[in-house]
Amino acid sequence: MQIRWYGHAAFMVETGGAKLLIDPWITNPLSPASPQEVINAKPTHILITHDHFDHLGESVDIAKATGAPIVGSFELMLEVAEKGIPEAQTMPMNIGGTIKLGDGVEVYMTPALHTANRGAPSGFVVATPEGTVYHAGDTALFRDMELIGELYDIDVALLPIGSVYTMGPREAAIAVQLLRPRRVVPMHYNTFPLIRQDPEDFKARVEAVSRAKVFVMKPGDVLKL
């Protein structure tokens, strides 16, 4: 398994023959890639946590170019259908639900404490034979993260630390305590001035309360499991 960060909350999780593109705002100011480069990478599925512009991103254009199905909440799938995505190319689900993508890859939709234009914001747990990744989406800290950690043996947690619109470093470090992942990658920070944070501060906070290993990635970096 490998996880590539495109900046902000955009990631590509590759495992076996699956390439799961999550929250593809590829034109974000930190991204080293263009939408065409991501299209050329041929994602097999596109996962969207909610419909704010910085998460919906270029998902519709990428889906149209590649034929990759879009996974997200029922209401969000109605929204992308209005933008020209055929119903057959959508995979609607809801919080607490599970879908199987084949080759042993399963996607669980988790709660997130945030807002959305349509539908409920969410996170995703991607469970594969090579490891399990939790993408928290945009969220505040919430106690049921402990339950997510109990239900899923998380190898990598992708957590927002930018504050203002999500939890900040202090709260995200507590989230690590609740989730108990083996590895943590901070995300959703330094994309614009309002969410400027020092990821090393987050790393120090986590190391003070947890044995999880923090990987401070640069946009374009790849984490291999």
From Swiss-Prot:
* SMART domains per the UniProt record, alphabetical: Lactamase_B
Q: Does the keyword Kinase apply?
A: no
Q: Which UniProt keywords apply?
A: Hydrolase
Q: Which GO terms describe its molecular function?
A: hydrolase activity
Q: Which Gene3D superfamilies match?
A: Ribonuclease Z/Hydroxyacylglutathione hydrolase-like (3.60.15.10)
Protein known as: UPF0173 metal-dependent hydrolase Pars_0810
- Do you know which Pfam families this protein is assigned to? Lactamase_B_2
The protein's matches in HAMAP family, at most eight in alphabetical order, are given as:
UPF0173 (MF_00457)
Coiled-coil regions, chain positions: none
Q: Which family does it belong to?
A: Belongs to the UPF0173 family.
What SUPFAM superfamilies does the annotation carry?
A: Metallo-hydrolase/oxidoreductase
Asked if the record carries the keyword Cytoplasm, the reply is no
